[in-house]
Design a protein with these regions (language model features):
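Short, basic/aromatic-rich helical patch in the C-terminal catalytic core of site-specific tyrosine
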Residues: 23, 101-103
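Strand-loop-strand
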Residues: 95-96, 108
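Gram-negative outer-membrane beta-barrel transporters
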Residues: 3-87, 157-159, 166, 170
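Short, well-ordered turn and helix-capping elements at secondary-structure junctions
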Residues: 81-85, 100, 107
Length: 173
């Protein structure tokens, strides 16, 4: 950084090697859909002695969403896993899992819903401080996990002109 209020971002001085693989799978049975994904990421800083892993890049990420949907309802349950990461100082973080649930009822006029995100309340503040230093001179460590924790929302998607017929087979039953 140039000063406490100005920063310069620049490219890495030499090569970064990134290898990996990602897979996404979808299973469907009647009104059920199950999505699974996994990513393996091996990104190394070739210009640093020992070729350490790139900071804030988890080697393993996975997710799963199970969705039930028909013309009247949409219900979804999700699980996401983020593997351990390294911070810029070489410290290894905790891995974590987040869970979510969505329930939505469809009507001609719209769709009320209730949504629970990260209902296991996984957040960085449970593992390490999010702010260091003093009130007048705060220091913000790297962010590697959710900062919000549990989020609960209730809402309505309003369709002022009525519900449009969907051509998707999940709504035709």
């Amino acid at each position: 950084n140039i000063s406490p209020t100005e920063y310069i971002f620049s490219n890495a001085p030499e090569n970064i090697r990134s290898l990996g693989s990602e897979t996404n799978v979808k299973f469907t049975y009647k009104d059920l859909r199950w999505f699974i994904n996994y990513a393996l990421i091996d990104t190394r800083l070739k210009y640093v002695e020992g070729n350490p892993l790139k900071p804030l890049t988890p080697k393993h990420n996975a997710g799963s969403v199970l969705m039930y949907e028909n013309k009247d309802w949409r219900i979804g349950y999700e699980v996401y896993y983020t593997g351990k990461q390294y911070l810029s100082n070489g410290t290894q973080t905790n891995d974590f899992t987040t869970l979510g649930l969505l329930i939505q009822k469809h009507f001609k006029w719209g769709s009320p819903y209730i949504n629970f995100e990260n209902f296991t309340d996984r957040r960085q503040g449970r593992y390490s401080p999010e702010v260091l230093g003093t009130v007048r001179n705060p220091v913000f460590p790297e962010i590697y996990a959710p900062t919000d924790g549990f989020i609960f929302t209730v809402g309505i998607n309003i369709k002022p002109f009525g519900r449009e017929e969907c051509t998707d087979d999940c709504h035709s039953k």
